[in-house]
C-alpha cells in the first residue's frame, strides 16, 4: 500500500542521516524507533524495536488516561510515562512516590497487558542501512508489528532472511544501496 511505501521512504531517509549500522521502524509517516551505532545488526534491531514498542504503548488507553496532577509539566509526564511502561512503575506508582505525579494511584500496566496490546500491532515498516545477515533480525522485527522491510540485500544468507519474511507474511524489498557513512 501507499502508506507502506511512504513509511519505508521515511525510514530510509532517517537512516541516511543516522550513524552507520542502523535500523529504523516507521509508521504513519514518522520514525518511531531508531537503533544506531551498535556493534551488530541484531542489537540495532532490538534497540529500535524497543523504542517502537514504547511508542506504541504510549498510545494505550491505560497510559493516555493516567490521572496526572494538573501541575505536572510535560517533561515530567514524559519521564513518568517512560517509567510506567518500561517496567519501572515502582519508581512512579509506589506508595510515597505516586502522590508526586498523580491524583490517584494508577493500576500497574502489567507485562502481560503490554504483550497482549503489542501483539495486535501490524503494518510497521522497517528500513536498514545494510543487509540483515541473519533471520534473527526478522524474528525480532515481527514482535514489533513489522510487515514491510527495505534493506540493501547482499548477505550470503539472504535466502534464509527471505524465507523468514515469507513465514511471517512480510514484504521485503532489496534497495541494492547501502546507506553507510563509511
Q: Where are the regions that the model predicts?
A:
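Short, conserved, surface-exposed binding loops centered on an aromatic residue
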Residues: 14-17, 25, 115-118
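Short beta-strand scaffold segments in enzyme catalytic cores
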Residues: 21-29
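Short, basic/aromatic recognition patches
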Residues: 1-21
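Feature captures the catalytic cores and cofactor-binding loops of soluble hydro-lyases/lyases
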Residues: 39-182
Amino acid at each position: 500500500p501507499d502508506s507502506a511505501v511512504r513509511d519505508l521512504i521515511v525510514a530510509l531517509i532517517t537512516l541516511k542521516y543516522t550513524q552507520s549500522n542502523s535500523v529504523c521502524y516507521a509508521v504513519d509517516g514518522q520514525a518511531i524507533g531508531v537503533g544506531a551505532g551498535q556493534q551488530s545488526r541484531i542489537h540495532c534491531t532490538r534497540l529500535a524495536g524497543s523504542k517502537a514498542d514504547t511508542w506504541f504503548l504510549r498510545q494505550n488507553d491505560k497510559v493516555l488516561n493516567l490521572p496526572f496532577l494538573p501541575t505536572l509539566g510535560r517533561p515530567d509526564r514524559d519521564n513518568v510515562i517512560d517509567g510506567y511502561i518500561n517496567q519501572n512503575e515502582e519508581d512512579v506508582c509506589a506508595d510515597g512516590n505516586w502522590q508526586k505525579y498523580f491524583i490517584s494511584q494508577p493500576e500497574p500496566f502489567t507485562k502481560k497487558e503490554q504483550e497482549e496490546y503489542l501483539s495486535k500491532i501490524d503494518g510497521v515498516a522497517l528500513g536498514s542501512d545494510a543487509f540483515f545477515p541473519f533471520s534473527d533480525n526478522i524474528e525480532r522485527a515481527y514482535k514489533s508489528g513489522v510487515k514491510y522491510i527495505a534493506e540493501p540485500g547482499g548477505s550470503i544468507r539472504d535466502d534464509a532472511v527471505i524465507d523468514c519474511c515469507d513465514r511471517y507474511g512480510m514484504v521485503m524489498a532489496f534497495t541494492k544501496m547501502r546507506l553507510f557513512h563509511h
